């Protein structure tokens, strides 16, 4: 009986020792780049469009709506970010200048911007406010 057990054990040992690791096959192209993989891991983001058309009830603006139209009285970017984070999104992308040309940040390059609106008496900067809120709450922030 011992000889039989020894023989069976020896056969299994020989079988397992003869197995060697085989290299996996080369991937079939195209293979995603590290940047593409990083992009996929970002998952869902909030894409925020908030500008002059929010206040003039138009679907499409042509750059002829006065900058004074932009006047959010209770804008709370932190509230947006808290809700976005609670919804499980990973970050926020803000349309900082839509097709109508209105800039949501103060700039000296064009007059059609937030500094020429009544929002915070012309001292507002929605890009900065949303960016700061994202940093505070640990979300990524991007601009479109």
Task: Report residues per predicted region.
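Mature catalytic domains of secreted/periplasmic carbohydrate-active enzymes
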Residues: 21-144
């Amino acid at each position: 009986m011992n000889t039989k057990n020894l023989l069976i054990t020896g056969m299994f040992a020989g079988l397992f020792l003869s197995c060697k690791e085989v290299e996996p096959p080369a991937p079939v192209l195209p293979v995603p780049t590290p940047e593409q993989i990083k992009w996929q891991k970002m998952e869902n983001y909030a894409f925020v469009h908030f500008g002059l058309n929010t206040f003039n009830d138009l679907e499409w603006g042509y750059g002829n709506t006065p900058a004074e139209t932009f006047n959010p009285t209770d804008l709370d970017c932190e509230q947006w970010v808290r809700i976005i984070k609670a919804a499980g999104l990973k970050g926020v992308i803000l349309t900082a200048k839509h097709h109508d040309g209105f800039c949501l940040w103060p700039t000296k390059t064009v007059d059609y911007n937030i500094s020429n609106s009544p929002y915070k008496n012309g001292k507002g900067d929605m890009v900065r406010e949303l960016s700061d809120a994202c940093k505070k709450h640990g979300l990524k922030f991007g601009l479109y």
